[in-house]
C-alpha cells in the first residue's frame, strides 16, 4: 500500500496574505488575573518604591505646580452666576 500525503502548503500563503499578516498586539499592562494575592500585593508596593525620578537638563528639579490649576466646580459655577448677574444688571440700566 502507498504512503498517504501528510502535509501541503499549496495556496496557504495566498490565503494568509488576503487579510494581511499583522503583528501581534502588545499590551501595555499584562493582566494579574490568577496571580497569587501576596505576590501581586508585593508587586504593587515595589512599583510604588521604584517610580522614575524626573530629570531636566541632567539636574534633579522639583516638579512645579501648574500655572492655572483646575478650579473646583463650585467656584466655576459661582463665577458664572456672578458674571450673568452683572450682565443682567448692566442690561437694566
UniProtKB/Swiss-Prot annotation:
Feature: compositional bias, Basic residues: 1-31
Biological processes, Gene Ontology terms: cytoplasmic translation
GO molecular-function term, one example from the UniProt record: structural constituent of ribosome
Keyword Ribonucleoprotein: yes
Pfam families with a match to the protein in the record: Ribosomal_L29e
Domain of life per record: Eukaryota
Ranges in coiled-coil conformation: none
Gene Ontology CC terms: cytosolic large ribosomal subunit
Chain residue ranges for the region called Disordered: 1-33
Keywords for this protein: Ribonucleoprotein, Ribosomal protein
Protein name (record): Large ribosomal subunit protein eL29
UniProt organism field: Dictyostelium discoideum
Amino acid at each position: 500500500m502507498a504512503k498517504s500525503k501528510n502535509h501541503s502548503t499549496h495556496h496557504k500563503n495566498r490565503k494568509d496574505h488576503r487579510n494581511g499578516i499583522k503583528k501581534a498586539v502588545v499590551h501595555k499592562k499584562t493582566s494579574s488575573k490568577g496571580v497569587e494575592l501576596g505576590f501581586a500585593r508585593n508587586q504593587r508596593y515595589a512599583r510604588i518604591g521604584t517610580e522614575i525620578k524626573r530629570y531636566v537638563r541632567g539636574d534633579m528639579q522639583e516638579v512645579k505646580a501648574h500655572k492655572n490649576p483646575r478650579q473646583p466646580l463650585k467656584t466655576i459655577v459661582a463665577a458664572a452666576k456672578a458674571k450673568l448677574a452683572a450682565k443682567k444688571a448692566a442690561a437694566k440700566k
